[in-house]
């Protein structure tokens, strides 16, 4: 079990439910070698994450692709049966910035519908693939019946990544005029810039003692939101031939340390799903 002194803390553990070959850095290699998509490792890695959460009694939010329904319906049901929140990650893991209005509407509505039918649970939240959120998507999410978004990542220097152009952005939960809530990912100030500490590659690559100090400050300030991908706890997933040195670092570095890093933050802080916060 985790610590009992932060049961009401606004600390969220979220998972982008994707297989290793769906990572952004892998897409150019997948186009050259489509057979990569036959080497599935999602289920075994996701079950490990579920077991880790269960061992501490925590609930998480799992942002799931609609196209997982069918092959992975039983896995999606398992997430819900273990008391976790199933939210939408879109249908096809396509960046929202590449969609016209009609395609965007279909992605949002169809993923919500198909996931709700699969797990018999209301899908309240959404996260854009690769944090490719847009102002238009915020309005479309409200029209599609979502209650919150979790795609804003207010870091410095990455254009189009977790950013809105005209609508407001903040580092803590806030509400848009259309009623949609936003649960942004956590950043930290480093001089005049905001850098990510919220998970994914950043959680793997930064020195962990430094990260813990920044996380501790975020928790004390009342809001910490971290995310992971199931493949990031799998140091044995396939090594792509011909991968560049930089991409190899980006994708594979510190995979062997990820489970321990998650265990350490689980033992130090309490975590909830976003849905728990909205209904409490």
Language model features: what each stretch is:
Residues 18-20, 67-69, 92-93, 131-133, ...:
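Short, solvent-exposed loop/turn segments at secondary-structure junctions
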Residues 117, 121-223:
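Active-site-adjacent pocket scaffolds in enzyme catalytic domains
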Residues 2, 6-82:
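Active-site beta->alpha N-cap acidic-glycine motif
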Residues 46-50, 73-77, 105-112, 138, ...:
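Generic structural signal for well-ordered alpha-helices
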Residues 32-40, 63-65, 92-104, 124, ...:
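The substrate-binding groove and active-site-proximal loops of carbohydrate-active enzymes
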Residues 16, 53, 86-89, 111, ...:
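Conserved, mostly hydrophobic/aromatic
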């Amino acid at each position: 079990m985790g610590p009992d002194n932060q049961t009401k803390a606004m600390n969220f553990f979220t998972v982008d439910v994707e297989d290793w070959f769906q990572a952004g850095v892998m897409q150019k290699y997948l186009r050259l070698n489509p057979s990569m998509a036959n080497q599935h490792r999602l289920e075994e890695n996701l079950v490990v994450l579920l077991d880790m959460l269960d061992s501490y009694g925590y609930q998480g939010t799992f942002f799931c692709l609609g196209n997982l329904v069918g092959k992975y319906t039983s896995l999606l049901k398992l997430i819900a049966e273990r008391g976790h929140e199933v939210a939408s990650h879109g249908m096809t893991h396509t960046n929202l910035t590449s969609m016209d209005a009609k395609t965007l509407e279909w992605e949002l509505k169809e993923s919500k519908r198909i996931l709700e039918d699969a797990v018999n649970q209301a899908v309240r939240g959404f996260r854009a693939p690769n944090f490719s959120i847009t102002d238009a998507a915020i309005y479309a999410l409200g029209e599609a019946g979502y209650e919150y978004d979790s795609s804003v990542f207010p870091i410095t220097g990455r254009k189009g990544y977790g950013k809105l152009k005209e609508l407001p952005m903040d580092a803590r939960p806030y509400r848009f005029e259309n009623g949609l809530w936003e649960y942004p990912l956590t950043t930290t100030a480093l001089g005049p810039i905001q850098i990510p500490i919220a998970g994914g590659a950043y959680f793997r690559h930064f020195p962990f003692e430094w990260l813990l100090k920044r996380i501790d400050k975020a928790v004390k300030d009342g809001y910490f939101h971290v995310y992971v991908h199931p493949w990031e706890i799998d140091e044995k997933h396939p090594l792509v031939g011909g991968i560049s040195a930089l991409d190899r670092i980006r994708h594979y570095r510190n995979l062997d340390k990820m489970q321990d890093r998650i265990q350490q933050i689980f033992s130090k802080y309490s975590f909830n799903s976003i849905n728990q916060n909205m209904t409490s």
